[in-house]
Amino acid sequence: MTQYKLDYPFAIAFKPQHMGNVLAETLGTQGVNQVHVAETEKYAHVTFFFNGGVEKVFPLETRDESQDLVPSNKSVPTYDKAPEMSAAGVAKQVCKRVKEQKFEFIMNNFAPPDMVGHTGVYEAAIVGVEATDKGIGEIYETCKQENYLLFITSDHGYVVSYKPLHPCWFYSASVAG
């Protein structure tokens, strides 16, 4: 439908929108050091998508995939089999980055509420949300100790519009989902 890659060999129905002055770009031009942390399943969300759908590293945006790209568990067929995903590793890396005191802006994405929610396995979704909650708690405590402001938001997460036992691998138009 739209052109996500320049080398697609088929007709495009909708040209991609150009997003100018995205937050990462604005922070960089204002002299704000930044880093983005996520596990493999959501790393594109804190880089490519957050940066307006472009493969670009903006000024003062640190990308160290050896540290800030936390490996997702690839040993399971679906994430209801390991619903914590890598929430603990993401939280640990965010806390490490906060303690370094090098970045005025640190963002992350926790995958379990979305990825586990899509499986339709209610008990697993609870475990995934609990792992995320624990990670947020650790980040909160570290931010408090290091005098950082913590701002929590969400773009979506399938678990909020949950229907147990009904796997859903698409995104709804619901504000909740």
List the predicted regions and their residue ranges.
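Feature captures the catalytic ectodomains and active-site-proximal regions of enzymes
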Residues: 1-177
